[in-house]
């Protein structure tokens, strides 16, 4: 698994634009969103129980991530058509404002394989979060088992702390003081 300090290698995944436009699909690579931080959130599967709670909770903070020059990307190994169908079928997902992705490739350009979060026994991604700086260097990684959801507020808190470039105490709140 890639970890803090590792750089993203070339990859290509299918992005799904927010708001279900006609031209919803596009390619996301390591060069997409130049100059931005990337918060990459993997979840196991579309049409499940825990996953939409995470996606909706992350989306509620989408503007907070954007305010920090970060692009929020949530996705799984389900294909792009599955994502659009899920967004159409699930009332809360119809309103999401962030980019989703389908990581269906295997091999050289597979992001999930590069990051090491494909969980073969389930045929799905682990609940993994990567915060990647504008130079494509991983600054933070968390990985949960399939049954435990994450705290988007904690992800935002860590992003905010990383962006200070300073020492940050435990439980430092977003925008809080750093250690001098």
Report each predicted region and the residues it spans:
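Chalcogenol-based redox active-site neighborhoods
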Residues: 1-180
């Amino acid at each position: 698994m890639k970890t803090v300090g590792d750089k993203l290698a070339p990859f290509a995944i299918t992005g799904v634009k927010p708001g279900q436009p006609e031209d919803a699909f596009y390619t996301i690579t390591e060069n997409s969103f130049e100059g931005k931080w990337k918060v990459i959130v993997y979840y196991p599967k579309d049409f499940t129980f825990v996953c939409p709670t995470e996606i909706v909770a992350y989306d509620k903070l989408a503007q907070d991530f954007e305010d920090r020059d970060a692009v929020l990307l949530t996705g799984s190994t389900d294909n792009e058509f599955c994502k659009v169908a899920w967004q159409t079928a699930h009332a809360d997902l119809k309103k999401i404002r962030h980019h989703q992705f389908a990581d269906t490739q295997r091999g050289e350009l597979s992001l999930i394989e590069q990051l090491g979060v494909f969980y073969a026994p389930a045929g799905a991604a682990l609940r993994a979060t990567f915060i990647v700086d504008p130079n494509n260097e991983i600054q933070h990684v968390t990985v949960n088992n399939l049954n435990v959801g994450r705290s988007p507020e904690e992800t935002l808190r860590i992003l905010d702390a990383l962006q200070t470039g300073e020492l940050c105490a435990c439980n430092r709140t977003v925008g809080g003081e750093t250690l001098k």
